């Protein structure tokens, strides 16, 4: 069948850290040329959708509407709004995460927040972990924006948000609710955004543990491109095979898939 819509990862798929992936750029340009609906679904919480839009245009030659960018931050806010608890929160994360949550009407509370939200934080320290630990012990709802233990960069694999969240889970003995890929919370909303049936969509990404499992675990066909996290030599040993595997997105045939 020919897919009618695409859910696409960013880091490791369309670009890698600060480095361009020309095949990723060409892939998006072809989607735009063919007027095929797509949504960038990213676990990155360090940037707002507007910041992601600007980065794609300025650094990677991809002009895309902000409405085509769905981050784990937006999915986290949607989830918190659906829960409907008091709008107080303690956030470990970068400005992109904090500002978006505050813009949604949530107020920081370090003592007795209704939520503790943890994403990637380049300046994380012991005191932040201590504050979050005490709040969770008091009953704060523990949310992890995404489970990525590592993130691919031009320097190599670095600790991701999942590494920080795992530390807090160990300290509190409380399991977090994870929002980002591969979890259903973000994928259900992403599918809703496209307005298509799941079998009409393909999830495109470089990380088997997040992107591809997001497809497999949620009934969506998957396309693994081995330009980032998951390496070609690992494909044969994957527990459940992706629907499609490519070494480069230039190999993708839009007319046959």
Please name every model-derived segment.
Residues 2-8, 15-33, 47-50, 54-70, ...:
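Asp-based, Mg2+/Mn2+-dependent phosphohydrolase catalytic module
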